[in-house]
Structure formats: structure tokens, C-alpha cells
Amino acid sequence: MGMSEKASDTGMKGKKKDKNERNEKILNLTLEMIYLLTGEGYVIPKKKKSGDDMAPPQSCTDCILEGGCRCHVTNLTGGRALHAPGSVIQKENNKNDKKILELVSNIIQLLTGEEWEYIKRKKALYMEGIKEDPQQLSQWCEYEDKSIVMCNLEATACLNNDPRNDTVFCEHRDLSKFDTSLAEQSLPAIGIKGEPVSCEGANQSDCNINPLAEQIQGTDTPTPIMGCSLNNSLSDNYISNGIKTEATSCEAGNQSDYGNNPVAEVQLTDTTTPVKRCSLNSILSDNYIKIAIKEEPPSWEDENQTHCSINAPGEQNEEIDTPTSIMRFCLNSSLLDSSLLNAIKDDTLSCEGENYSDCSFNPLTEQTSPGCKQFTCSECGKTYTRLYNLKIHLKSHTDDKTFSCSECEECFTDHTDLVIHRRLHLTLKAFPCAECGKCFTNCTNLRAHSKTHTGEKPYSCTECGKTFRDRSHLNIHKKRHTGEKPYTCSECGKCFAYRSNLMVHVRIHTGEKPFSCSKCGKCFTDHANLIVHERMH
């Protein structure tokens, strides 16, 4: 234990010494750069030696407190004396610039050299990390020889990654023919949660993962499914398409083509063996976020895999037919919106002699379900989807107004209308007049009313000088001077300057007399005539 501790202490001291030397070099280079930039130097004072230490002058308080000042700092240029502060130095720009660049490069080497020396010693471990993260490869190649870092062309190409245990299944392939565009393309935003796939006794000839050509942000990484290819045709504004696929077992079957092929068409490697694949083609509408599709695990045992696909309408995908009969079945999954898909048609497979029956399903092709009840009014034939709405409508035929206002006694057929009416009474009391107590619905009307108490008439006619409290009254008055009469009676053709006068005139033709005297019962067409009549009583 004693020897090991002593060795560790020696190693720590050595590291500390190296670090101090490096810091001293950086400091020396920095001060030399300052000298080249400013042209100011420092005088080296002669210090008295007491043993091995050099003491600063006792007259300088800065040296006593801090251990050194500007005038007594030891020069870092080999001990030669420099010019005193404030002296004029001839500047040689070209030489100084070159020296400054050299000093900067030396400082950078001192700061970064330690990391790259450590990486060189741990080269084997770092190479494994580069294989997992290809982005580090380009950074490494900027500093080191590419022949050292580049992967061996005889290395193995990964065919499948198991997300659960991070196990990598690889086979020997020539990486010189490997698709290098995969590193340049971004992974698609298609989240596929895949279970482990086992392939026993199967011929694996090709496995390609071809992501989308355009960059779509996503978090999940697609996992290749052995024996199945997932073709997702996405529209413009998709974020993610979550598909949870259960385990697929392939035993004693020929698997020649399997991969993940999104919208970007990338040619797969041609093979001589017959292609038998299970492709999932989803064409989605615009602006939808997620579609959750859970697919049960099909199994292939001692049989050839039949051609199966899930094709949404809108795009024809060329598939390879097989002699095995194709059964159509329905993927009945709850979708997010009625306008999401008009139809989903699925070409599925027969596994182990079991055939699925034919049943097609078009989710929510109509806005209203055909089995929805329709409530029809017996009076007018109007239909409603809710019985409550029909009952309210029937009251309009019977004039049944059971809901009445407690303040004005106005009646309504629906309680909702009564609630809305009561709010009017509340708003009428919102702006009361301080002089007479009259209430108004808004502040503008209250301000106009207050002018009646103050007698203010700010609007005057330029023709006759008559004043008015409101601008609208002034505009009506101006029509007398211009002689404008825009309102014409349709019966006799008589014209009027005011709409109110036209309405009174029309009552002469219709015989309507809505204003009646409460004492004698006499009726009048105009309210002004009624007021004149009431003065007689």
C-alpha cells in the first residue's frame, strides 16, 4: 500500500509539474504578444539574492503586498532588459504580424494538444465511438490522417439493430458498394416501435434503410423489420406516424428483400431470388399528427410469404403478385378525424392455412351516420337530430310562451332567450344619469343625454345658425336647406326628407292607427298627434 501511494503521489506531482510548465509557456507567449502589439516593455531590476530566492525592493508597496508590480515583473524574453514604459519603439509591422500569428498557433497547440495526444493513446476505443456516431468522423478527419480513421472496406455492414438490448447483427459486405447517401440524409419522423425479429434458416440477401429525402424532425428512429418493408407515402405537413409492430417470426422461409422505404425512391439491390415481402403503404391527408396502428404478428412457418400490403386510396403502388390467393380484410382502427381517410383497403396474407374473410371499411365517409335518428316536425316537416331541439321548435307553432320576464313581462318560448333578454335589463342599468336617474346601455348615449341637462349644443348649422346637441340632428336639418328628399312613397310617389315622415305617410294608405288614447279610445297614425289629443283631456 505504501509503495502504491508513493507512486501515485509521484505521478500527481509529475502531472502538476507538466501543467505548471504548460501554463508558464502560455503566459510567456501571451506577454510577448502584448509587447508586440503595444510596443511597451519592462525594465528588469537587479534583485538581491538571499539564498535561492530573489526579494523585491522594500520601497515598493505593491511588491511587498502582491509579490510583484508592473515595474518589477521579471521579463519573459530570456532576461534581457527592455525599454522603459513610455519610450518610442520603431514598429516593424510585417515582422510583428508574423510573430503574433506564430505565438497564437503555439498557444492553440498548447491548449489543444493534450486532448489529441490522449485520443491517440485511446485510439481503439475512440474508433468504436466513431462507428456509433458518424458525425465525430468528420471532426476527427479534420485533424488526423483520413487513412487512419476511415473504416476498413472489409468491415461488416450492420443489417439490423435491436432497440431492446442494443445487439447488432452484421454480415460481411464490401463497404465500398455501400450506400453512402444514408449518412447525408436525415432520418424520417416515423416512429416505429419494433419488437425483436428472429430469422432462422432464412437467406438474408439485402436490407436497406432508405429514409426520407427531405428533412423532417422526429425523435424515434425507424427499426428495420425482417421480412417486411414499410412504405410510408406522407403528404406535406406530417409530423409523425406511429406504428407499433409486434414480433414477426420467419422460419424456414426465403427472405430476399426487406427494408424501410419512405417517400424517397431509392433503388434496392436486385436479387435473383423471388421477392416476397409485406409492405405497409400509408397515404395520409394533410395536417394530421398521429395515426396509431397496431398490427398483430403474422407468422410464417415452412411457407412462402405471400404478398400483403395496406394501401390507402390516392396512389397506386406496384406490387409483385404471388400464386397464393390474396384475402382482403379490413383494418378497423379508430381514426382521429372524419376527413382523415376515405377508405382503407388492405391486402393481407394467409398464414398457416388460415384465411381472413373479406370485409371492407371506409371510416366516416359521411358526416352523419346513416343509423342516426331523425326527429321530424309534423307541422312543417323540418328535421332535427335532437329531440330537445324539436320540442323547442314545436312551441313556435303552438305559441306556447311559458317563460316570462319579471320586469317587463315579455314572454319567450325558450329559457335561453329569456336569459339573454334579462341581460338587456342589466346593461340598461349600467350607465345611469346622475341628474334624472335614466339608464343607458353605453357611455356614448349617456354623454349625449347629459347635454340636455346642461343645455350644451355644440353643433350649429352654417346656413341658418341653428344649434343642435347631436351631429345626427344637424345632418337631418341640413336636408331642409338642400331640398334633398331621398325617401319616396311606393303608393303615391310622394317624397320625404325623413324616414319617420315616410312611415307616418304609409299608414294613411294602409289605414293603420297604432296609437290610441287611453281615455276615449281614439286612434291615430302618428304619436305626435296622440300627444296633442291627450292635452285636450
Swiss-Prot record:
Q: What ranges does the record give for the region Disordered, renumbered to this chain?
A: 1-21
**Alphabetic keyword roster:** DNA-binding, Metal-binding, Nucleus, Repeat, Transcription, Transcription regulation, Zinc, Zinc-finger
Zn-finger regions (C2H2-type) at which positions? 375-397, 403-425, 431-453, 459-481, 487-509, 515-537
Q: List the disulfide bonds.
A: none
What are the GO cellular component annotations? nucleus
Pfam families (UniProt xref): zf-C2H2
InterPro entries linked: Znf_C2H2_sf (IPR036236), Znf_C2H2_type (IPR013087)
**A GO molecular-function descriptor:** RNA polymerase II cis-regulatory region sequence-specific DNA binding
Biological process GO annotation list? regulation of transcription by RNA polymerase II
Lineage top rank: taxon: Eukaryota
Localization, per the record, is: Nucleus
Q: Name the family.
A: Belongs to the krueppel C2H2-type zinc-finger protein family.
User: What is this protein for, i.e. what is its function?
Assistant: May be involved in transcriptional regulation.
Q: Which PANTHER family match?
A: ZINC FINGER PROTEIN, ZINC FINGER PROTEIN 771
- By what name is this protein known? Oocyte zinc finger protein XlCOF29
Species this chain originates from? Xenopus laevis
